[in-house]
Amino acid sequence: GVQTCALPILTFLFSIYFLFKSYQQAQASGYLFYSFLFIGAGSILFPQLTFFSVLWLFEAHRFQSLTFRSFCGALIGWTMPYWMLFGHAFFYDQMELFYHPFKELATFGDIFNLQILQPWELATLGYLLVLFIVSAAHCVVAGFEDKIRTRAYLQFLIDVTLFLFVLIVLQPSQCSNLLPLLMISNSILIGHLFVLTNNKTSNIFFIVATVCLILLFGFNVWTLLRSE
């Protein structure tokens, strides 16, 4: 249900929070432990979150928080929810519960088969892609105006958003699960653009983006009603 869908999103947000906290920390093991603990917990319900653990390690390296000790902390954090799941599954003789996330992770749908996406999903993806290109370009061009830490965080969000777009193209069947995560990272980038720019071009783009958002909302509602 809605709660099951919301849990991976919450774990995703908490994981990002602790990853950000690890920025240039000499003792980052605890932060990376919690960051990967949430990724691991979320991946039990949505196994594709596991893919982000690879990106997280790369970003931790860029944040200068990845050492052998913090890597071990991350590894322990990610495996802990699975040890708990294994204990539950073994005790109640329901080992299929433990195997399920790994089977889901290994099961790929039709790669690049975007035809399976609903019209509202394609429209939403197109809208988010345009916003991403504009906001990412602004971050790259005007990045010198931000603090070094802020630039690192924004680059992380660009990487995550790009990673999500690639995942959706590779696994279109997971689009409905990946879209909320895409909206989170994209909304922060576009918010950064609108807050820090105040000229005629950005104002026009803001108005156009808002009008398109209203039209997109109307289209999504119309599509939903039509399908019923």
Can you name each region flagged by the protein language model?
Residues 175-193:
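Hydrophobic/aromatic-rich transmembrane helices and adjacent perimembrane loops
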Residues 71-106:
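Membrane-lumen/periplasm interface segments of specific transmembrane helices
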Residues 99-122, 135-139:
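Juxtamembrane membrane-water interface segments that cap and precede transmembrane helices
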Residues 1-7:
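Short, small-residue-biased leader/transition segments that mark boundaries at the very start
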Residues 15-30:
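Membrane-interface transmembrane helices that cradle and orient dolichyl/undecaprenyl
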Residues 30-47:
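Membrane-interface alpha helices of multi-pass inner-membrane proteins
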Residues 136-160:
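Membrane-interface helix-loop-helix junctions at transmembrane boundaries of multi-pass membrane enzymes
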Residues 52-76:
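Perimembrane helix-loop-helix junctions
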